[in-house]
């Protein structure tokens, strides 16, 4: 009821154990709600993060399995996030499923797609997923990075550190187009990434001659698997 009375409703997200906080606009009578601010908790208080991608990708993950970089958009801002996965044999009975910063039901759906469409047997394995930095991301375009990180951990094979990706996964294993692909690619290019996996449909209308980053279009999960792991 209170939300209908006031002009603006802001939601402050974060956890006391993480340094980053997100300020979202849920209702704004005088402007857009498609905006958000990212802040870092320091000893002297909250400070705005002007370039969240650089902070969220500050850790060196070269040669590490279970890590994939996604180009996400929250509000109107593109930024890159590190998706981490750990897959191990279930030695304590029922397999465990845990997701931090990502919807657990959606992760279970992606695991079912991997098992049904790609043939990876994950039903008897523990799967843990984490979005680095404590951020909660709702962008479906990080689906491709989620399954890539899971496959990387399951095979114990690292993804090249200069690879970034964006794509939504459908139930038949297709990689569906995502919105604002130019902004996602531009953010990855700005931070020095060399290859970008994207849905094949999104390649239409992009002037690849002006880009310094290699675009790798994929239609199915199987194609993304071959592009990443050979």
Regions found by a protein language model. Name each.
Residues 1-230:
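Peripheral, non-AAA+ core regions of ATP-driven protein-machinery
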């Amino acid at each position: 009821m209170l939300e209908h009375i006031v002009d603006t409703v802001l939601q402050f997200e974060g956890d006391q154990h993480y340094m980053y906080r997100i300020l979202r606009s849920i209702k704004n009578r005088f402007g857009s709600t498609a905006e958000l601010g990212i802040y870092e908790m320091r000893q002297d208080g909250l400070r705005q993060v002007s370039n969240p991608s650089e902070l969220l990708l500050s850790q060196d993950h070269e040669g590490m399995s279970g890590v994939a970089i996604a180009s996400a958009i929250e509000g109107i801002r593109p930024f890159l996030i590190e998706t981490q996965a750990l897959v191990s044999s279930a030695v304590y009975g029922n397999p465990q499923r845990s997701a931090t910063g990502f919807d657990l039901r959606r992760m279970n759906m992606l695991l079912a797609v991997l098992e049904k469409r790609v043939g990876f047997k994950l039903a008897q394995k523990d799967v843990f997923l984490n979005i680095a930095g404590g951020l909660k991301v709702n962008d479906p375009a990080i689906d491709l990075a989620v399954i890539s990180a899971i496959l990387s951990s399951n095979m114990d094979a690292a993804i090249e550190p200069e690879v970034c990706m964006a794509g939504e996964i459908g139930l038949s294993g297709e990689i569906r187009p995502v919105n604002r692909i130019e902004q996602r690619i531009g953010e990855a290019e700005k931070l020095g990434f060399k290859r970008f996996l994207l849905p094949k449909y999104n390649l239409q209308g992009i002037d690849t001659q002006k880009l310094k980053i290699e675009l790798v279009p994929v239609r199915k999960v199987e194609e993304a698997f071959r592009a990443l792991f050979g």
